[in-house]
Amino acid sequence: MINDLQTINTNDYDTMAKAMGIANERPATASKQSNLARVKIQHSPLMGKTEVRGKEVNVEVVEGGTYKLDIPNGASYYGTGAIIRPFMQRFMYKKYVMGTGGAKNRYVKTIMSDNLNIDLKDNDGTFNCGKPSGWIDDFNSLPQKTKDLIKAVKRVRVVFGNITLTDPTDEKGNSVNVIAATPFIWEIDNRDAFKSIGKCFSDLAKSKRLPVQHSITLATQSNEMNNGNVFYTPAPTLDMTKTLDIHPEDQEMFGNLMS
């Protein structure tokens, strides 16, 4: 069984690809999560204060479009870019639920799977965050309530691995020394980000390479909305020219992720 795997074997692509979540990738034509740092993109700049001619003025200390790394029960760090070594990917659905009355805002999330071709139980006791299962032939014929529900449920690509931030700073813009190769989890629900990161995994699968054997360099791309606001999406570059060695600590991390 997949969950019995505890060792990375680069000579058994099919088994390892299944374990690392890329067995179902096709060409374009064809838990210990709480202990992992969380990766996200910081869309808005962080502001601070500085003194100019005896007066305090607001200044931008961390630019928008940086990668944010939230350390569990610790600080947050920011990098102009990042290099990740992905160990595996998983998939899930999630839905944002706005709180009413005394209830807080929350997310409904399903369990994770190595594909989205099955029904996934969620933390509300239903499946797929309430989204109807199976292929929908005529979306427009559905009741408006059902269409709204389907639109509210997001596909999520969850990436696990190690990350090294580029030029890391703290929330005040001060340079910091962040330990390299920090274990992370990254929940990717933006549609364009889902596709761009997914292409890296698809390219690995086409070449029968395991995610852990290669690194991905991350930049960001700015996107302007109709109201003038800007949001950022990942701009990944997969390095297929260099094969990374597997060390005992990598085996240990993989075992921890699979347990």
Regions found by a protein language model. Name each.
Residues N9, E187-N190, F194, T243-H247:
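Intrinsic-disorder-associated interaction segments
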Residues T146-V153, F160-G161, P183, N190-S196, ...:
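Conserved, folded interaction/cargo-binding domains in eukaryotic regulatory proteins
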Residues L165-F201:
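Short helix-loop boundary/capping segments
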Residues I2-V176, M225-T233, T237-D245:
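OB-fold ssDNA-binding interfaces and closely related basic DNA-contact patches used
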Residues S196-S259:
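Long, compositionally biased interface segments
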